[in-house]
Amino acid sequence: ANVPNTTDKREYKKLLVNIKNNMQKDIQQQYSQPHKPVFITYQTGAQYMRDTLSISMAQLEAANECDDIICAGPIYPMTDRGGHLDGNGYRWFGEMLGKVYYQSQVQGKPFRPLQPTAIARETLPTQIRIKYHVPVRPLVFDTYLIPKIKDYGFEVYLRDYRQENKQIIKQVEIDGDDVVLTCEQPLVGDVIVVYAGTRSFIEDRPKGKDGLQGHGNLRDSDPYKAFFKYEDLDEVQKDGTFIHPRDSFETRLRPDY
């Protein structure tokens, strides 16, 4: 009760830094260690996105502004059930955190996730160019791990983030470390670019189950290989019963896609 919460980006970032400082202080006092432990966070995403993506932006900005915070990246590529990661998703998430910790704290190499660094208008009035920090080239649209999201997860709006101001995107293409968006109409006035937002959906399933809001297909080419393999949560035994338990009304645990 009476715990502060917010969806405002600045306020959330301040609260995130506060809890980071409090946790580090507690650990240093409890274990008498001189150094602050690193604080690794993910980016809120998938079904938990809200409008202007203020929370995920606050998490990324905090990591970029504080030397002792590392953003490991989003978790939307990982399998979930109703927004909560399933066994495979949590295992994958754990490996992502382990990779980031090992690279940054054991190998001593800095880690920054794939992220935009600049957005600029092109000569053509219908085009926008988004420049990225790409940890491992090349930049890729991946439709293997996630079904193809409409426009690979990108959305463009004029003036404000309202459905009626959403622009029709004719083409999305990768150009080196950049993504170039070509819209149907000239982009005049304030332009808002959204990636993996609340209105994203599987391209061939705009109104179907598991539309995958908060998802996109853009990734880098990190060569890291997982230690563990995906487990079929719907595998059955010889007697026809499921290996992994479930409620009586559930016929499958795998994501619908």
Residue ranges and their predicted role:
Residues 1-257:
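Cell-envelope and extracellular/periplasmic
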